[in-house]
Amino acid sequence: MTFVTLCRGHNPGMNPLDLPADIGRVLTDPADTAPFLLDWRKRYVGRARAVVQPSHVEEVARLVGWCAEQRVPLVPQGGNTGLTGGSVPDDSGTAVVLSLARMNRIRAIDPINNTLTAEAGVVLATAQSAADAAGRLFPLSLAAQGSCTIGGNLSTNAGGTGVLRYGNARELCLGLEVVTARGEIWHGLRGLRKDNTGYDLRDLFIGSEGTLGVITAATLKLFPKPAAQVTALAALASPHAALKLLELAQSMLGPALTGFELMSQMCLSLVARHFTDCAAPFEAPHPWCVLLESSDSQSEAHATERFDALMEQAFESGLIADALIAQSIAQSRRFWALRENISEAQAAEGKNIKHDISVPISSIGDFVAATDAALARQFPGVRMVVFGHLGDGNLHYNVSPPLGMNEDTFLAMQDDINALVHDAVAANSGSISAEHGIGVLRRNEMLRYKSPVELALMRTIKDAFDPLGIMNPGKLIG
């Protein structure tokens, strides 16, 4: 990692063993700390004086308070599954990594209030299972749900496949428990759906990537479990056709439409190549494919009847060329595996350049067509691996190298490719980060695309919440 950012007044001569007592488990052996210092994509590797794993909020508060007194940088970390380098320290070796992995308790489930209170280190899949056991649904769902954590989901305002119906992490959170940059504990786990008593502090911490404080627990919204779900794959010619299918599906299914995922043929080809249990779904390849899911509150028969009517209308309108409707839970899971394995398949294929962007839904077709053409002109042979949550305007517009090109040669093009893609995003009034966050990877680009007024306001917030600059320095706003 090339960035080094020291907090204000940092004491560089301190020994790691000067850490205070009663802060939880302390790791200093390189073999123990190594997994916490390398990001998921293996692009960023840092050093730290120690990795600390508290098990209670009071231990977090003691550690943060000590870091504030000693001017020691602190890097909060959840499952370390982020894609922008936001959860690992720089290479100065001055920081303490605060791993929340041991704060992994479900504190409460209230089926009447439809809430679940989970500590920051609870794995997302564990929260989903706890809700399911209580007869409820926690709808946040993403490919890394077996290893990402609630704290990380909230710190990056994670999205996932259910945003179309349920919203992103911010919209699923009712309350937070936070340790401030001064080591104080804010007890905000009230679980209220209405609270008009001033500034919404919760919303400031969500999406702040650990730069304002440490989220230690959250009260989350639960929903009734659907009586039935129907999943289908639809083959079509273009993102423009997918947008028309989305409009039709929303008009016929309304809020029952809970998933609408777009995938290019390149995505499906990579998944079939690198996952032997994920065969190509259709006999003949099609340029694009959509994964649709409907959740029904009445019955399986009612859900199937409505979905069949949608598919019939889509065929009659010429929107889709082929379709497969899952006939079992196992087949539905196979359909979802095609979508969820895309990132892993692209990683297995080799280095790639990722873009987590959003544009107005109505602009997606034109954006993809124009950007594909521009990349093909300026970087002949590059392979566009495009997929994402069409229903909320979020695309993972990734680029893989031409076949046979040296990876280092390809990565040398990264700044130019990023500029082309992100300029196109800006021209469409979009965002260069829809759900992955800014971290280190997008920090300089955010400074380029945000207005001076926005940046000044963000810096004012950062200075107010973290006047010493100890919280995850060098990330997000810098």
Where are these regions (language model features)?
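N-terminal flexible segment immediately upstream of the FAD-binding catalytic core
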Residues: 3-65, 82-114, 143, 267-279, ...
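Activity-critical C-terminal alpha-helical subdomain
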Residues: 184, 443-478
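FAD-binding subdomain of flavoenzyme oxidoreductases
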Residues: 105-259, 471
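Alpha-helix capping/hinge segments and adjacent helical runs
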Residues: 426-438, 463, 467-471
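Conserved, mostly hydrophobic/aromatic
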Residues: 67, 210, 397, 466
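C-terminal substrate-recognition/cap domain of FAD-linked oxidoreductases
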Residues: 27-34, 220-224, 233-236, 243-413, ...
